[in-house]
Amino acid sequence: VAHGTDSDNTFALSSTGLVLDSRVNITRTGLTTLTLDGLAGDDTFTIGSDHGYATVNVDGGSPSNTDVATITADGLNPVTVTLGTSPVSTTDATVANTGIGTVTLSGVEVANVVAGTQNVTVNGSGEDDDLTYQPTGAEAGTVTKAGLGVVTNLSGVGDLTIDGIGGDDTLTVVGTTAVDAFTVTATSVVHASLQDANTISNVDALSVSGGESADTFGVTAGAIPIFIDGGDAIGAGDAITIAADVNSATFNTGPETDEGSFAIGGAAGLVSFDHVESLTVVGTSVAGNAATVNGNSADNDITLTATGTDDFTVGIDGQTVTFTDFNS
């Protein structure tokens, strides 16, 4: 065990040993587990690969502000981040990789995980996890869990997998203040220029929030409900394009002109939305492409306008839905 002090301490672990506050060099001899105890203060932990320990326990202690751990994987093998339970957990998260072994984090508010262009899996827990992922760069993103004190910043990511593991889990993918273009399914959220959530599994509900600017969402319905929040309307506003393929589409208007939902064919999950100004549903001009439009409890004013062969728009109380390649 390497103890810090009640002041701010800096721990640096690498293949050459452990350095504490740039002055104490501790060399490993026949040990498999190392504990770094920051005690009080705002401590910094830097952990590199090939340090020789199977397990490194990082305890940030009681911070006056923030304890930060930066963990750099070997750049050769995948990385797995497992989030702890909330609100009380002896372990906030673990980070595992062949080159670093298993790093457990307790009392650490910020975990920076550098994957070296390798694939990263972020696992939830067996409880009901409320997860949020925000892409921040071409190979970077941030994952948080409601009720858990650690913010996990990922960089150098190859493919990203987010797995809820167990419980009734939700995932929210958050865009930026700039223009975002998302391709959304029940099992992935792809961003046009930032790090994707390439694989999503064991999640019971998915939300995608565009934030500010005029964002676009290409959506395919699936086994779980998908909610799209366009955010504040800028310019032409936010747009959803629903891929119906060979299926029917039922549109349910909402209480406001920028909200409602779609049921697509036999997909179990509704696609619902709010703060979205442009709505398009695309079929394939087959017999199964039948459109149904449902009003709400108000006195609805519905207008059907043909725009081409198998193409038409339906206006309902100021809200317009464009159906393309729908034959009825």
What do these predicted regions represent?
Residues 1-328:
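Acidic, glycine-rich low-complexity segments
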